[in-house]
C-alpha cells in the first residue's frame, strides 16, 4: 500500500514537470512573438514619422503654390481691363458717379503699369501685359478726349447771357474735380490750356456782368446830400416834392434814420426795381450793394480756384489778377463816379466803415487777393470824406445869416440841431475807433467854424447877457445830444462844448 502511494506521488510530479515545460515553451513562443511585434512596431513608427515629414513638406509646397497663385492672380486681374470699364469710359454718362469711379479704376491701371517690384517686372515681361498696356493707353487717350470736351462745353456755358455760374460750376466742375486732376496728371499741357481758357472766359464774364450791374444801378435815384447851412430855397434832390425834400433833408445828417446793416438780403437787384424807382436811396446802399456783390463773386471764385486747380500761393495772385484785373479797374471807375458826385459825408463814412469790415472779414476768411481792392477803396474814400467835410465847414463860414436883435432868444438856433445831428452821427460811426482818423480833425474844424458862426451871429446884439444865454443854450444842446453816444470822438467834442459853456458861465 505504502509503495503504491509513493509511486503515485512520483507519477504526479512528472506530470507537473511536463506541464511546466509546456508552459515554458508557450512563454517562449509569446516572448518571441512580442519581440517580433516590437520590431514590427519600430518599423511602423519609423514609417509613420517619414510619412509625417513628407506630409509637412507637401503642405508647405501647397501653401507656397497658393501664395504664388494668389499673387499671379492679382497681377493677371490687374493687367486685364474689364469690359464694363472700357464701355463706361468710352460711352458712359460723365455726369453719373459711375464715370468718376471708372476713371479712378483707369488711374489705378495706369499707375499700376509703373510698378517696379520684382513680381511686377516679371509679369510686365509677359506678352499679355504688353497687349493690355496698349489698350490701357488707348483708353487713357479716350478719357482725356472726353474730359477735354466736357470741360470745354462747361466753359462755353459761362458765355451765355444771364447764366447763373454758381450751380454750373458746382455740379459740373467741383463735383467732378477728379476729371481735371486726371488731365493734369496725364496731359499737363492740355490741362494748362483749358485753365487758360477758363481764365479768359471768367475775365470776360465778370467784366460783362458788372457792366450790366452798373447800368442797373445807374437807374437808381441816389440822394447826393446837401451842405449843413440853412437855406430858405434849398433845392430838392431829383425834383422831389416839398414834403419829400424836407423829409430826406432832415434825414441826411442823422445816422439813426438810415438803414444800419447791409448784407446780401439788402443788395439792390432787379427784383427790387419797383421799390427802387419809387424811393430814392442813400449812397451807402448803392456802394454796399456793389461791394457785396463783388465780394461774393471774388470769394466764390477764389475758393473754386483753390479747390479745382489746386494753385500754389504764387499762382493764386497771378490767376486772380488775370481774371479780375479788368473788373476791379472798372469797379474803381464806377465807385469813383458814384462817390465823386456826392456830398453825403455820413453815407461816405458809412461806406468807409463797411469797407473796413469787409477787409477784416477777408483776413478772417483767408481771401487775401481782395484786400488790395479794399485798401484802394479806403484810400479813395477818406479824401472824399474830408473834401465833403470841408464843404460843410466852408458852408458855415460863408453862411450870411442876418437876424434882428429881438430874434436872439433863449431857444437854440435851428442850425445847432443840424450840427448836433452831424456830430452825433460822426461819433456813432466812430465809437470803436482807437486810432487817429481824419474824422476827428474834420469834426473839430466843423465845431470851430460853427462856434465862430454863432459868435458872429451874436454880434448884432449889444446885450452880453443875452449873447451868453443864447450861446450857452446852443452849446448845451450839442453837448446833450453827444451825451447819448460813447467813444473818443464824442467825448472830445462833448468836452469842447462843455468848456465853452463853462467859460460863458464864468463870464456871466
Curated annotation (Swiss-Prot):
Whether Protein transport counts among this entry's keywords is: yes
**Could you tell me what this protein is called?**
Vacuolar protein sorting-associated protein 52
Tell me where on the tree of life, at the top rank, the source sits.
Eukaryota
The gene designation is: vps52
Q: Name one GO molecular function term.
A: syntaxin binding
Q: Name one GO biological process term.
A: retrograde transport, endosome to Golgi
Protein purpose: Involved in retrograde transport from early and late endosomes to late Golgi by linking the vesicle through the t-SNARE TGL1 to the Golgi, leading to the membrane fusion between late Golgi and endosomal vesicles.
Species annotation: Schizosaccharomyces pombe (strain 972 / ATCC 24843)
The UniProt entry's sequence similarity note says: Belongs to the VPS52 family.
Compartments reported by the entry: Golgi apparatus, trans-Golgi network membrane
Going by the UniProt record, its keywords in alphabetical order are:
Golgi apparatus, Membrane, Protein transport, Transport
Provide the Gene Ontology terms for cellular component: cytosol; GARP complex; Golgi apparatus; membrane
Q: How does it assemble?
A: Component of the Golgi-associated retrograde protein (GARP) complex.
Q: Which Pfam families match?
A: Vps52_C, Vps52_CC
Membrane topology, as annotated, equals: Peripheral membrane protein
Listed InterPro entries: Vps52, Vps52_C, Vps52_CC
Amino acid at each position: 500500500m505504502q509503495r503504491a502511494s509513493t509511486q503515485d506521488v512520483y507519477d504526479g510530479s512528472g506530470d507537473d514537470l511536463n506541464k511546466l515545460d509546456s508552459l515554458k515553451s508557450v512563454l517562449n513562443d509569446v516572448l518571441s512573438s512580442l519581440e517580433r511585434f516590437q520590431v514590427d512596431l519600430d518599423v511602423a513608427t519609423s514609417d509613420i514619422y517619414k510619412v509625417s515629414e513628407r506630409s509637412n513638406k507637401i503642405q508647405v509646397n501647397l501653401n507656397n503654390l497658393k501664395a504664388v497663385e494668389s499673387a499671379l492672380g492679382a497681377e493677371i486681374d490687374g493687367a486685364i481691363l474689364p469690359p464694363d470699364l472700357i464701355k463706361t469710359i468710352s460711352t458712359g454718362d460723365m455726369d453719373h458717379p459711375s464715370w468718376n469711379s471708372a476713371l479712378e479704376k483707369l488711374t489705378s491701371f495706369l499707375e499700376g503699369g509703373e510698378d517696379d517690384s520684382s513680381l511686377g517686372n516679371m509679369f510686365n515681361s509677359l506678352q499679355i501685359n504688353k497687349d493690355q498696356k496698349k489698350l490701357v493707353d488707348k483708353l487713357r487717350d479716350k478719357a482725356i478726349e472726353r474730359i477735354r470736351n466736357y470741360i470745354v462745353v462747361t466753359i462755353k456755358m459761362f458765355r451765355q447771357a444771364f447764366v447763373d455760374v454758381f450751380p454750373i460750376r458746382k455740379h459740373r466742375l467741383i463735383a467732378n474735380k477728379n476729371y481735371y486732376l486726371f488731365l493734369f496728371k496725364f496731359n499737363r499741357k492740355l490741362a494748362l490750356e483749358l485753365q487758360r481758357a477758363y481764365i479768359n472766359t471768367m475775365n470776360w464774364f465778370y467784366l460783362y456782368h458788372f457792366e450790366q450791374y452798373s447800368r442797373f444801378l445807374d437807374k437808381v435815384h441816389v440822394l447826393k446830400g446837401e451842405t449843413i447851412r440853412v437855406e430858405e430855397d434849398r433845392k430838392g434832390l431829383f425834383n422831389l416834392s416839398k414834403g419829400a425834400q424836407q423829409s430826406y433833408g432832415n434825414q441826411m445828417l442823422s445816422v439813426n434814420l438810415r438803414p444800419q446793416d447791409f448784407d446780401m438780403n439788402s443788395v439792390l437787384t432787379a427784383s427790387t426795381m419797383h421799390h427802387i424807382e419809387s424811393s430814392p436811396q442813400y449812397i451807402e446802399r448803392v456802394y454796399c450793394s456793389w461791394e457785396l456783390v463783388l465780394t461774393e463773386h471774388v470769394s466764390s471764385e477764389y475758393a473754386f480756384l483753390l479747390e479745382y486747380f489746386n494753385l500754389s500761393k504764387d499762382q493764386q495772385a497771378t490767376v486772380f489778377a488775370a481774371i479780375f484785373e479788368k473788373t476791379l479797374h472798372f469797379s474803381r471807375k464806377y465807385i469813383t463816379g458814384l462817390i465823386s458826385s456826392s456830398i453825403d459825408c455820413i453815407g461816405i463814412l458809412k461806406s468807409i466803415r463797411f469797407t473796413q469790415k469787409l477787409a477784416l472779414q477777408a483776413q478772417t476768411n483767408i481771401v487775401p487777393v481782395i484786400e488790395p481792392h479794399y485798401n484802394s477803396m479806403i484810400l479813395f474814400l477818406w479824401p472824399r470824406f474830408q473834401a465833403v467835410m470841408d464843404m460843410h465847414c466852408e458852408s458855415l463860414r460863408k453862411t450870411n445869416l442876418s437876424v434882428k436883435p429881438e430874434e436872439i432868444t433863449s431857444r437854440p438856433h435851428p442850425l445847432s440841431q443840424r450840427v448836433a445831428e452831424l456830430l452825433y452821427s460822426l461819433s456813432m460811426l466812430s465809437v470803436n475807433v482807437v486810432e487817429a482818423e481824419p474824422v476827428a480833425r474834420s469834426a473839430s474844424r466843423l465845431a470851430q467854424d460853427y462856434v465862430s458862426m454863432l459868435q458872429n451871429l451874436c454880434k448884432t446884439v449889444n446885450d452880453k447877457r443875452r449873447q451868453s444865454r443864447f450861446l450857452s443854450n446852443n452849446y448845451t444842446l450839442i453837448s446833450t445830444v453827444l451825451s447819448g453816444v460813447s467813444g473818443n470822438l464824442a467825448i472830445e467834442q462833448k468836452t469842447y462844448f462843455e468848456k465853452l459853456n463853462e467859460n460863458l458861465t464864468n463870464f456871466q
